[in-house]
Amino acid sequence: MAMGDDKSFDDEESVDGNRPSSAASAFKVPAPKTSGNPANSARKPGSAGGPKVGGASKEGGAGAVDEDDFIKAFTDVPSIQIYSSRELEETLNKIREILSDDKHDWDQRANALKKIRSLLVAGAAQYDCFFQHLRLLDGALKLSAKDLRSQVVREACITVAHLSTVLGNKFDHGAEAIVPTLFNLVPNSAKVMATSGCAAIRFIIRHTHVPRLIPLITSNCTSKSVPVRRRSFEFLDLLLQEWQTHSLERHAAVLVETIKKGIHDADAEARVEARKTYMGLRNHFPGEAETLYNSLEPSYQKSLQTYLKSSGSVASLPQSDRSSSSSQESLNRPFSSKWSTANPSTVAGRVSAGSSKASSLPGSLQRSRSDIDVNAAAGAKAHHAAGQSVRSGRLGAGALNAGSYASLEDTSDKLDGTASEDGRVRAKLSAPLAGMGNAKADSRGRSRTKMVSQSQPGSRSGSPGRVLTTTALSTVSSGVQRVLVNSASAQKRSKIPRSQGCSREASPSRLSVARSSRIPRPSVSQGCSREASRESSRDTSPVRSFQPLASRHHSRSTGALYAPEVYGASGPGYGISQSSRLSSSVSAMRVLNTGSDVEEAVADALKKPARRRYESYGMHSDDDANSDASSACSERSYSSRNGSIPTYMRQTEDVAEVLNRCASSNWSERKEGLLGLQNLLKNQRTLSRVELKRLCEIFTRMFADPHGKRVFSMFLETLVDFIQVHKDDLQDWLFVLLTQLLKKMGADLLGSVQAKVQKALDVTRESFPNDLQFNILMRFTVDQTQTPSLKVKVAILKYIETLAKQMDPGDFINSSETRLAVSRVITWTTEPKSSDVRKAAQSVLISLFELNTPEFTMLLGALPKTFQDGATKLLHNHLRNTGNGTQSSMGSPLTRPTPRSPANWSSPLTSPTNTSQNTLSPSAFDYDTENMNSEDIYSSLRGVTEAIQNFSFRSQEDMNEPLKRDSKKDDGDSMCGGPGMSDPRAGGDATDSSQTALDNKASLLHSMPTHSSPRSRDYNPYNYSDSISPFNKSALKEAMFDDDADQFPDDLSLDHSDLVAELLKELSNHNERVEERKIALYELMKLTQEESFSVWDEHFKTILLLLLETLGDKEPTIRALALKVLREILRHQPARFKNYAELTVMKTLEAHKDPHKEVVRSAEEAASVLATSISPEQCIKVLCPIIQTADYPINLAAIKMQTKVIERVSKETLNLLLPEIMPGLIQGYDNSESSVRKACVFCLVAVHAVIGDELKPHLSQLTGSKMKLLNLYIKRAQTGSGGADPTTDVSGQS
């Protein structure tokens, strides 16, 4: 068909004037391309003139935009220089801010879109952070594409097209997001908008080959809008031309159904477009296309046949509708090039030098062909190397073999042929062979013959000429003779059906044909033949390791491993192993001439890089990636998905892809993402801070994944790897991780899933600091927002018990939260509904008692009497049972022969980890109680209880003395009970009585420095912190680190001072530089844990004021982080807040109003620490006015905070403060918010727990019903804490 005909055919149908109008203008992409980022198309989208959209002067009408305009606009932007990733991030943040707000002036938004292109031209894609910010730009680009200003829409479309052109498959996420919006532009009456949208979609289809785009296009093929349907089929046709088969396989059924609907479309032009797509479908899926054709009604079959005949593509029809066909070649050929085996002249046409611009698109590869001889490409290579050029279209004898042609990148710029309607160059048929098959050119310029070589099903094993599609002859003349003979004989059997299933095993050319085919299937046979499926097996490939992995610069879209000189000589090897490729060439040698031809065939086979599949890990043996029968180009094969390098084998860009899949709403994509994440983690690929944060958010949501069996199991496996690789960076997320895993232990899960949850808990326990885990568990236990089920309670208690066995005594922190948690555990020992909870709670108390006996004893002393009684009774029973158990086992040879000193078992350093291996007692704790009797134990324990209750705290002067006196022992010996306790293995008289042991324990209480006391009746900040009184380095050395003074060089504080100054400078950038300020806050949080006191002396006030000011920042994550830093400073240096208590309390309470839950949670945590850090009297005086005047939720937070403070106040002090406290609580009891009323009741209960019936006179204003409710809560608190005097009644009734 002549070029003129092509043009008129192109111009027939036009909706908005952007159909191709000429094949002459070359499609050039100015964007810089690296070899690792090709244009991702199987054939050059515009090798000799890409489709051009009609311009304003063309049929598009005024305002229409064509692709040439797009290409010019790609680089027609202001030049810009990128000096650092930080500068790039700032620029992208500003662009996003402008584009996300449609209130900005339209020209500002248009310039912002141009600036994105400027960044691309300047090489922004080389920076890792660019892809992270590109994800954030999705929404802004969509908003711009919806804009009412046509200029903004045009710039948005150009920018999207440029992103697709430069980034290729890396733009998959953005393309998926923007394509639906672009389709909405198609029916727009403004030509500039409609044509811009269409052009952008074309660019995306050409350069971004993402299977997820297919449903977006096919869904628009059934749109109510006629122009949208027409365009959609046109786009679908382009997609079928440009994409590799493996990218289409997943949606083959959708494509068939869509094309079928298009052929039945009510609109005539849409039907014409749909018929065009049939040819593309035929090239990729011949079987499905034939099935589709046969399912059509005769009238539609006839229309399709007529159309294909008129376009010269009758060879694409099924066998029944043409005179001859090949039962095999057409199945394997991607572009139905049936004429090639009979047409040697085409080789000359393709190899001869010409003026085509086929290589204008760097990195693109032509589609591979299935009918290439082993010798053909080698000959073409030799021919090319010798500089031979056959411009006449004829081929000299011996230069190339019959049927050979080079559909190669290397020779694609030497084509001498006709330009087809879509701009691709097709070879002309030369005169001597023109009559040799009645050749016709289809609408794309392909030459086809009606008569091609064909063999009968029964004769395949004896037909060596079929090997490599009957092209293995060394001269043109003999090749022509053979082809003519085969063609003539085949004419008589024009209706042979395609071979099915088992009939293919006998054909020696099956494997080789499949090997050179671009249809990525392990075996072309559809049925029971397993012979060829070996090609996809990973275990039968002896020479797989010739060359490890194709380098990343190979074509991503072709799905083929690249061959440096000749592409496709023995097939591109679509993920097929080296040995299979070798065997194909060797099998072809049966009919090859000896000598150089054979050597070249072997050499060519050996040149092909070995492929390596993406292997999943051992836990997924049922996955399709491990299946022998899996497709050679299945989803996880080497050339899978969007390119030759699997998604999960790329480094920087694939993390974003993996995270996107993990966050997908589709469970199968989440599973894929988890699999990819596992691969990254197994390869020790560490994630950046931003990636970690996002992954933690995704994982938090995954804990509630409804697809438990499918996704949650794999999530748990990935979680284990994630924790092991990033345990040092996940301490901020540990609360969520630990609490969610414990909650899952209480859920109804399959046994295998529950085992994985348990494994994740075990890994968590081993990976994080014990003290941090312990604090989180204490916090979780007392969290009033949680109502754990019985199973969850058991899980929490068992975890605490196991953790206690591996904790050091110093990890046991006697804080208010710990006391509250222990009191709750004591109440759980009487849980009426579950014996498991009762037993687990008892075990926890015993474990904590064993962990740090002095500290735990002090803690019990700070609890109300009812709690003490419950715990004392339990410990008494435990000691009695342990003693009896040891006595009964004394005669056993298995018992440890050397008894330990009684001081040893009472020592807090005797943790279960040291002792459990030395005893066989049921409790797994090692008590040396051979010489104890139960009466001694009971009396001694009673003495300890009395000592606790009568314990008197020393004065402030006495408190500071031990600090100096025992400076070297303070963080070791004295915390463990004095010098006598410093060595847990200290020997002693084995016959010491139990009374002596318990006396040691009681004396240990009195010898403890009181700054470690859990609760002082008179406020002392050192009771609530681990800091030392004199905040300077010399005192620090003298008090604690005399022996290690050299660890504190003199310039340490100076370095820290400079660092703090830098951090403060960064933090002063309010509402700007979000990422940098986050980093600064994290650094500041680390500094809070370092004891550089001189630095804090200098900068504390500035830090505090900046943090409080940051609480008003517009970024919620910054506000939450500031509260966390404040909490850490409170925790480590509470004494510094004495002069800033009121300001700190006010700002922390105000943060409870924040609309973001993350900020509120951080505020609650800060308030909780604040309540235990500053002076109770000072705190109450600040809180009382707030409770009386503030609105919800500030008053609620203040009441909760006051409740915590009251738990620390002595009876005498509370009596003095009661007149200030009560009015606010009485007022709150009448509040309209039920949560405020409830908080007031709890606070009153806390007051009653301290002062008892002295509260009664202050409750006179309460009504009878409120008094009754209050009494109920008081009695519940008393009974829950181990029993109380039943006559207690604040109302005076008994």
UniProtKB/Swiss-Prot annotation:
TOG 2 as annotated region, ranges: 649-881
UniProt-reported outcome of changing residue 503 to D: Phosphomimetic mutant that reduces MAPRE1 binding
Effect of residue 529 to D: Phosphomimetic mutant that reduces MAPRE1 binding
Membrane-spanning segments: none
Effect annotated for changing residue 537 to D: Phosphomimetic mutant that reduces MAPRE1 binding
Ranges for the HEAT repeats: 173-208, 209-245, 250-287, 710-747, 772-809, 1054-1091, 1098-1135, 1216-1253
Gene Ontology biological process: basement membrane organization; cell division; establishment of mitotic spindle localization; establishment or maintenance of cell polarity; exit from mitosis; Golgi organization; microtubule anchoring; microtubule cytoskeleton organization
Keyword Membrane among UniProt keywords: yes
InterPro entries membership: ARM-like, ARM-type_fold, CLASP_N_dom, TOG
Keyword vocabulary terms for this entry: Cell cycle, Cell division, Cell membrane, Cell projection, Centromere, Chromosome, Cytoplasm, Cytoskeleton, Golgi apparatus, Kinetochore, Membrane, Microtubule, Mitosis, Phosphoprotein, Repeat
Annotated spans, Disordered: 1-61, 314-368, 409-467, 488-557, 617-645, 878-928, 952-995
Expression sites by tissue: Brain-specific.
The record's account of how the chain is modified after translation: Phosphorylated by GSK3B. Phosphorylation reduces MAPRE1 binding. Phosphorylation by GSK3B may negatively regulate binding to microtubule lattices in lamella.
Impact reported for residue 499 to D: Phosphomimetic mutant that reduces MAPRE1 binding
One Pfam family recorded for the sequence: CLASP_N
Annotated Low complexity bias: 316-334, 453-467, 627-641
Interaction with RSN and localization to the Golgi and kinetochores, as annotated region: 872-1294
Motif (SXIP motif 2): 517-520
Superkingdom as given in the UniProt entry: Eukaryota
Biological function: Microtubule plus-end tracking protein that promotes the stabilization of dynamic microtubules. Involved in the nucleation of noncentrosomal microtubules originating from the trans-Golgi network (TGN). Required for the polarization of the cytoplasmic microtubule arrays in migrating cells towards the leading edge of the cell. May act at the cell cortex to enhance the frequency of rescue of depolymerizing microtubules by attaching their plus-ends to cortical platforms composed of ERC1 and PHLDB2.
Name of the protein in its database record: CLIP-associating protein 2
